[in-house]
Amino acid sequence: MSKLVLTTDFPDLKLAARGKVRDIYDLGETLLIVTTDRISAFDVIMNEGIPDKGYVLTQISAFWFRQMEDIIKNHIISTEVKDFPSACQKYADILEGRSMLVKKAKPLPAECIVRGYISGSGWKDYKATGSICGIKLPEGLKESDRLPQPIFTPSTKAELGTHDENISFEKMVELCGKETAEKVRDVTLKIYMKARDIADTKGIIIADTKFEYGIYNGELIIIDECMTPDSSRFWPKDSYHPGGPQPSFDKQFLRDYLETLDWNKSAPAPPLPEEIVRKTGEKYMEALVKLTGKGK
């Protein structure tokens, strides 16, 4: 297990943003994205980190970005620190395995969610309305059922500490333009269906996931992260049983623990027991090993 990285401080690099998990440095023509071991739940960053989480997220993203290059280009220039600008080299011990040098794209103002199974907020929506985000679904579906076809449900990109809001496809057209919105929807569904089939052979069900896209040199590319346990619901195929919630290889384990507490889901976060931190880390690492065949 490597040293926990909760935050980075590189005085001679320009910090552009600090998100819930990632620290982003502006290197001029490019960006340096460092994935820390921070973890958030219900849009609140926990005080404790998850050992090796940044490594797992970076390696899983790189795996999926490579798999999807026949569908869409991505923002990665390199994940090898030796390829990074010289100003980054002195921080190699922190950056190794958890960072990416990426193209500086203009992000689209929407997050692109695809759901192949009915779970989480989608299940609540369906129980109340028979639809998910306004998309009518067949009657009689059970929690965690596979949907007849994957559905595309975009959302707004919320500021740090606030919640994303689901939007209609028509609203996405307003935000991004018709041609871009339609292309994003088509690409998102294609990526998901390819990934679902790959994951299936490795014993993982990808129930739903979230993508971000940007424009680089006039071209649509995929940015941020790609089908990690932070942006997706991963379920073990061998124990899949619709009709209730599923065990998972993602932070659902942490969310489930937090639901047992008398906590109002706003900052400050409650302290996490060592066992919850350890088990969450094990679930993340298990996802990496199952998907790529390699741990750390």
Curated annotation (Swiss-Prot):
It catalyses: 5-amino-1-(5-phospho-D-ribosyl)imidazole-4-carboxylate + L-aspartate + ATP = (2S)-2-[5-amino-1-(5-phospho-beta-D-ribosyl)imidazole-4-carboxamido]succinate + ADP + phosphate + 2 H(+). Keywords: ATP-binding, Ligase, Nucleotide-binding, Purine biosynthesis. It holds the Pfam family SAICAR_synt. InterPro entries: SAICAR_synt/ADE2_N, SAICAR_synth. Gene3D superfamilies: ATP-grasp fold, B domain, Phosphorylase Kinase, domain 1. GO terms for cellular component: cytoplasm. Its EC number is 6.3.2.6. Pathway: Purine metabolism; IMP biosynthesis via de novo pathway; 5-amino-1-(5-phospho-D-ribosyl)imidazole-4-carboxamide from 5-amino-1-(5-phospho-D-ribosyl)imidazole-4-carboxylate: step 1/2. The keyword Ligase applies. Belongs to the SAICAR synthetase family. This is Phosphoribosylaminoimidazole-succinocarboxamide synthase. It comes from Geotalea daltonii (strain DSM 22248 / JCM 15807 / FRC-32). The lineage of its organism: Bacteria, Pseudomonadati, Thermodesulfobacteriota, Desulfuromonadia, Geobacterales.
